[in-house]
A protein has these predicted regions:
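TPR repeat positional signature
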Residues: 32, 66, 73, 106, ...
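Inter-helical turn/loop elements of alpha-helical hairpins
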Residues: 42-47, 69-101, 109-126, 130-133, ...
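Conserved small/polar residues in nucleotide/adenosyl-binding loops
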Residues: 262-269
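Alpha-helical segment of the N-proximal tetratricopeptide repeat
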Residues: 28-44
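Residue-level recognition of tetratricopeptide repeat
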Residues: 62, 154, 210-211, 244
């Protein structure tokens, strides 16, 4: 069965207020961007790209749709090579961002550091060189740092920054001594990204139910010495965006590590 974008249950509208307030020409474009944004949160990047592409057909000057395409082809926590180069898309975003808000322009400018013409031209999918690189991921994380500070309290910006930090060592945030069993942070970056999320949860009640932050927190702590700290975030994801399978499945990453095996199976069953 092939699902249409509108077949997914994204939960209550306030979850994606960032997406529903982007600069664009009409409501149809806005609604399509919301769909793309939801799939982006769900790590369904191919479907997100299709939605963002539809946005650009409806409104070629929707800079954030071009940003979304570039973001979704970039390296991500589950697939470091990414899906391709976002250079052309982000250049288009830069070209049409004149009417955008300051926040949108800042996000577009930051993402432009992640994609270069040289990386695009040297891409070779046969060796999983898709036009992304660790060096470009570092550049993007560094570009997002001042934006995070400028818009502190904006939970979507916080999530984008945290994800940029996590992508610097995807699935390698923690080191385990196989002789002693001791688990320690891989580097200062791990401590930083965990602190950012935990401080945000403490300062903003809405952060505790923010799907992107809850998702990233589960990934950040699942291999840590204290996965149980992510149980509240996991509980949020069980029902927060019920049509998005990856987010509904995410609690099982924590459940398994804290030996809630029955709950883990239930989370996986709900996501299918």
């Amino acid at each position: 069965m092939n699902l249409k974008p509108t077949d997914y249950d994204f939960g209550v509208p306030e979850i994606y207020s960032f997406a529903s307030n982007i600069t664009c020409a009409d409501e149809k474009t806005r609604q399509m961007f919301v769909l793309g944004y939801g799939h982006m949160l769900n790590y369904n990047h191919e479907e997100a790209i299709a939605c963002f592409m539809k946005c650009t057909e409806l409104d070629p000057n929707c800079a954030m749709a071009w940003w979304g395409i570039a973001y979704c082809v970039s390296s991500n926590y589950n697939w470091a090579p990414g899906l391709g180069s976002g250079y052309d898309a982000i250049q288009q975003a830069l070209a049409v961002m004149g009417q955008c808000t300051d926040l949108e322009q800042d996000l577009i400018t930051a993402l432009s550091t992640r994609h270069t013409k040289e990386a695009r031209d040297s891409a070779d999918p046969s060796v999983l060189n898709m036009g992304n690189s660790p060096e470009l991921n570092i550049a993007f994380a560094e570009a997002m740092a001042p934006i995070y500070e400028k818009y502190k309290g904006n939970l979507d910006v916080t999530a984008i920054y945290v994800e940029a930090l996590m992508n610097l060592k995807a699935w390698q945030l923690w080191d385990k001594n196989t002789k002693t069993g001791e688990i320690t942070p891989a580097d200062e970056n791990t401590l930083l990204l965990v602190k950012i999320m935990e401080d945000t949860f403490e300062q903003y009640d809405e952060a505790k139910v923010h799907p992107a932050l809850c998702h990233l927190y589960c990934h950040a702590l699942e291999l840590s010495p204290f996965p149980e700290r992510a149980l509240p975030a996991a509980d949020v994801l069980r029902t927060r965006m019920p049509g998005l399978g990856h987010l509904v499945h995410m609690p099982s990453h924590i459940d398994a590590w804290v030996c809630l095996l029955y709950t883990s199976d239930a989370a996986d069953e709900s996501s299918s």
